[in-house]
């Protein structure tokens, strides 16, 4: 099977190296890989690491952007490169660089090719280092109460910190239950943005990802891109991988990340209204 992997990198090339090596081990000579790493203007040290990785593996292409274009826009750089230079590749893993692929990942991907002929996007079972499942991210919809909390969260940074603090104590009552269905394969509203599998059906409908924001909110924007064409994401627990973050830390943004998320939330509110 031919598999493409596209990821972005920004000043954390050690994650990229580990992701590539784990995917290479999974391919184990039985699958043909083509990998595109999109660097979003990292420091010279990290660019040097990526250049060495590209020299080590002939099937790894590294694109060095002259500016940081963001997450989905960065992935689109990789998608365009793949489609132009390696059009024979039709099945892709796209997403973060801080992923680790188990030894059976490529084989399990191959067993699910029929899904990618029906669904544009597959979301795999994504598990953090401390064992939290990040999919299915949103199965049906987000409640109005939670939407109001999101508005409060993005209204003020200090209020956002207070909401995070309160959520730690109310977690058993207020946490969304969607991820608890991680053992059930099903059609879902949103898959976690750290990794998606795309294939022929996606390219029958689209040329690339819809990327209206720099960072954050990708789950919704992809779900809208799909729903506008009458499609949804499919979640399967049969394909799994590790996301190299601790679940307790993934939801605690610094101020810069919060500002990116607020910009994405404002864009999101253009399409999803709490009332009306």
Residue ranges and their predicted role:
Residues 162-165, 210, 220-276:
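Active-site-adjacent helix/loop segment of glycosyltransferases
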């Amino acid at each position: 099977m031919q598999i493409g992997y596209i990821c972005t990198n920004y000043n954390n090339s050690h994650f990229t190296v580990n992701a590539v090596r784990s995917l290479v081990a999974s391919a184990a000579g039985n699958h043909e890989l083509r990998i595109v790493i999109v660097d979003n203007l990292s420091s010279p040290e990290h660019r040097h690491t990526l250049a060495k990785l590209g020299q080590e593996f002939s099937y790894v292409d590294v694109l060095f952007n002259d500016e940081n274009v963001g997450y989905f826009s960065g992935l689109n750089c990789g998608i365009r490169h793949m489609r132009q230079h390696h059009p024979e590749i039709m099945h892709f893993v796209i997403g973060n660089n801080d992923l680790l692929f188990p030894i059976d990942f490529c084989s399990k991907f191959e067993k699910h090719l029929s899904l990618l002929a029906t669904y544009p996007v597959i979301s795999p079972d994504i598990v953090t280092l401390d064992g939290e499942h990040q999919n299915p991210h949103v199965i049906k919809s987000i409640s109005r109460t939670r939407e109001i909390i999101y508005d409060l969260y993005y209204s003020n940074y200090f209020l956002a910190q207070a909401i995070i603090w309160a959520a730690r104590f109310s977690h058993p009552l207020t946490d969304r239950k969607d991820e608890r269905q991680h053992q059930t394969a099903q059609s879902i509203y949103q898959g976690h943005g750290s990794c998606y599998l795309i294939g022929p059906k996606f390219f029958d409908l689209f040329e690339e990802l819809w990327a209206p924001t720099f960072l954050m909110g990708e789950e919704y924007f992809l779900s809208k891109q799909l729903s506008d064409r009458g499609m949804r994401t499919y979640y399967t627990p049969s394909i799994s991988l590790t996301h190299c973050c601790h679940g307790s830390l993934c939801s605690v943004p610094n101020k810069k990340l919060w500002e990116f998320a607020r910009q994405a939330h404002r864009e999101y509110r253009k399409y999803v209204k709490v009332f009306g």
